[in-house]
UniProtKB/Swiss-Prot annotation:
GO terms for molecular function: glucosamine-6-phosphate deaminase activity; identical protein binding. Allosterically activated by N-acetylglucosamine 6-phosphate (GlcNAc6P). It comes from Actinobacillus pleuropneumoniae serotype 3 (strain JL03). The record marks 151, 158, 160-161, 254 as: Part of the allosteric site. The gene is nagB. Pathway: Amino-sugar metabolism; N-acetylneuraminate degradation; D-fructose 6-phosphate from N-acetylneuraminate: step 5/5. GO terms for cellular component: cytoplasm. Keywords: Allosteric enzyme, Carbohydrate metabolism, Hydrolase. The active site is at residues 72, 141, 143, 148. Homohexamer. This is Glucosamine-6-phosphate deaminase.
């Protein structure tokens, strides 16, 4: 696992966006050989999306031959709802780049058969071979996507009941009214994420410090699904200084020395 300890969330976003752009450009995707990118929603990746848009506008990256798969979507929330993840992705990213509409994949939380929708999603991912890079965020309780604590580390795309902690955290997007937050979501599984060629997690803020500690220093544990990243051969965690507060000093120093070049690239 790589841990890239930066100073600020702005540096985290800038490094992550540049890494994505570099991966796409190095891959040299074509219509017959697209680059497959996994994407999250939420507050953490917002600045990364803004930076990717800036790189696109500067002519430094194109999404013409990029296929995307989003992590999750609420169940029962219309696509047009202002807080649906469909709306989030188009408003904050897709509407501002040259991605082809047919290359955008987001789970449909309004189908009559959720199990069938989840199977379809898994098959669609497999049809491209693999996801080349999956970017993600992390919840305060260490969940990745909507794989809440005690989720199976071998799980696949499925419907999940959201925990009270998640409902409270997400209520800020619903007028701070927890009763308005959907209670269920469709989400890729932990194993789905681990199947990706590379997984990059963005962890920022004091409130994510325990999750970062569990990810980097803890044991692999289904109560902290983020810890499953330890099993991945190409896992990257990009964090800011506040998120490192629960890590051992020697851990931060170790990775700071290892990642000197990466750190200097955003200074």
């Amino acid at each position: 696992m790589r841990l890239i300890p930066l100073q600020t969330s702005e540096q985290v976003s800038r490094w992550a966006a540049r890494h994505i752009a570099e991966r796409i450009n190095r891959f040299q995707p074509t219509a017959d050989r697209p680059f497959v990118l996994g994407l999250p929603t939420g507050g953490t990746p917002l600045q990364t999306y803004k930076e990717l848009i800036r790189l696109y506008q500067a002519g430094e990256v194109s999404f013409q031959h990029v296929v995307t798969f989003n992590m999750d979507e609420y169940v029962g929330l219309p696509k047009e709802h202002p807080q649906s993840y469909h709306t989030f992705m188009y408003r904050n990213f897709f509407d501002h780049i040259d991605i082809q509409p047919q290359n955008i994949n987001i789970l449909n939380g309004n189908t009559e058969d959720h199990d069938a929708e989840c199977r379809r999603y898994e098959e669609k991912i497999k049809s491209y071979g693999k996801i080349h890079l999956f970017m993600g965020g992390v919840g305060v309780d260490g969940h990745i996507a909507f794989n809440e604590p005690a989720s199976s580390l071998g799980s696949r795309t499925r419907i999940k009941t959201l925990t009270e902690d998640t409902l409270i955290a997400n209520s800020r997007f619903f007028d701070n009214d927890i009763t308005k937050v959907p209670k269920y979501a469709l989400t890729v599984g932990v194993a789905t994420l681990l199947d990706a060629e590379e997984v990059m997690l963005l962890i920022t803020g004091y409130n994510k410090a325990l999750a970062l500690q569990a990810c980097v220093e803890g044991s692999v544990n289904h109560m902290w699904t983020v810890s499953a990243l330890q099993l991945h051969k190409r896992g990257i965690v990009v964090c800011d200084e506040p998120a490192t507060q629960e890590l051992k000093v020697k851990t931060v120093k170790y990775f700071t020395q290892l990642e000197t070049q990466a750190i200097q690239s955003v200074l």
